[in-house]
Amino acid sequence: MTSAFYGGDEVSAIVIDPGSKWTRIGFSGEDIPKCVLPSYCGEFSDGRRLFGEEYIYKSNPGMEIKNAIRNGWVENWDVTVDLWRYGLEQQLKTNPLEHPILITEPFDNPPENRVKTLETMFESLRCPATYLAKQETCAAFASGKGTACLVDIGAERSSVSAIYDGFVLQKGYQVQHFSGNAINDILAQTLRDKNFEVMPKYLVKSKNPVEIGQPANCELRPRDTTDSYHQFQVQRVYDEWKEECALISDVPFSSETTIAESEFEFPDGSRMMFGAERYQIPEHLFVPGSDEEMNEEPSKPIEQTENNEVSQQDSSVTNTSSRILGIPQLFQNCISECDVDIRASLLNNVIVCGGTSLMQGFSLRLQNELSKLYPGSRLKIHASGHVVERSYASWLGGSILSSLGTFHQLWISRQEYEEHGSDRLALIEKRCK
């Protein structure tokens, strides 16, 4: 590979940070990604695909909404490649042939996905060099930490990882598929229990003011969209509710707690007051199955299905595979798996990131819960108040990492890729640890 691609001054590297909900793309060394795209596409029966908010948010008859990334892993590579190419060529206005690309990956990314990522970089995007960086390590670097315990709460995954001297420790890694989208599911069930149907914005032609608790007075457009598009838009309403109404109590929530009610207006103009639900729904992140205030019965542990749906133990949903743990328990499991000698360093460098961690009260509650678990320890939580730093942590870390002068020796060149045609996984495991 030529020195131009190693140097970093002549040609800027590009950083791609794919997530289940958002994909961030930008230039190495910058402090914010140039392009943040939904990790979804609008797909038509003739094979056409649309990307970007301005296209997939607009209703189109027959357009299916597809997400190529599930629980942090790429599942549909055709869609993923088109998404990355759209971001690079249409948004960044760059030619991937001219830029080395650092791409982030979760620590538990399957070996076959790692190989496929490498092949995609060289065969589909045809970049001159690439590197696969752990998202957990990158997020720690974004906070200036080489050793840390990372609490990452995203859309589909909650993970706690121990990072020591820049490497994620296998034995301390904890992850489960219960996070922001699961909170949406619980909100959806809460509204169904109230016999309330969410009408997303695209269906509302006009609306008139109504009193709180009264049915909407609106004119709806005829629906000619697919179920996947409709549900995609409904999820956006749930996300808005979380941003406006959801609160996480600084102590375990009790039904006896006095709650200030908050009004939420739905897209069709209907207005609803939310009281205890503001705390009850996100409380599941810390105490899964915390429904005592709803049904006057002891809470049942939440189970996780193979389809990553959420149910109660007595639900009709079958094929449950694992019990959901609260975030403090995930954290405790992570620390207990690590060597005693490094635990103090981990506890003194707890980093919080991920979009779901931005819910009001999250960091304080985590601080209180961990202080109870480790009363004699020097506990320090680093939770940036900047939305970009918290949401884009792994991209920012990748930007920092790839801009270091010492990083040039880590790039995998096209020549190396071609030389390891029979065993590319070995190349990845040797270089991208």
From Swiss-Prot:
GO MF annotation list: chromatin binding
One Pfam family hit: Actin
Composition-biased stretches (Polar residues): 302-317
UniProt keyword DNA repair, yes or no: yes
Region (Disordered), start-end ranges: 289-317
InterPro entries per UniProt: Actin (IPR004000), Actin_CS (IPR004001), ATPase_NBD (IPR043129)
Primary site of residence: nucleus
GO biological process: one example: regulation of transcription by RNA polymerase II
Record keywords: Activator, Chromatin regulator, DNA damage, DNA repair, Nucleus, Transcription, Transcription regulation
Subcellular localization(s) per the UniProt record: Nucleus
GO cellular component: H4/H2A histone acetyltransferase complex; Ino80 complex; NuA4 histone acetyltransferase complex; nucleus; Swr1 complex
DNA repair listed as a keyword: yes
Family, similarity comment: Belongs to the actin family. ARP4 subfamily.
Quaternary context: Component of the NuA4 histone acetyltransferase complex, of the INO80 chromatin remodeling complex, and of the SWR1 chromatin remodeling complex.
Role description: Chromatin interaction component of the NuA4 histone acetyltransferase complex which is involved in transcriptional activation of selected genes principally by acetylation of nucleosomal histone H4 and H2A. The NuA4 complex is also involved in DNA repair. Is required for NuA4 complex integrity. Component of the SWR1 complex which mediates the ATP-dependent exchange of histone H2A for the H2A variant HZT1 leading to transcriptional regulation of selected genes by chromatin remodeling. Component of the INO80 complex which remodels chromatin by shifting nucleosomes and is involved in DNA repair.
Name of this chain's protein: Actin-related protein 4
Species of origin: Schizosaccharomyces pombe (strain 972 / ATCC 24843) (Fission yeast)
Taxonomic classification: Eukaryota, Fungi, Dikarya, Ascomycota, Taphrinomycotina
Gene symbol of the encoding locus: alp5
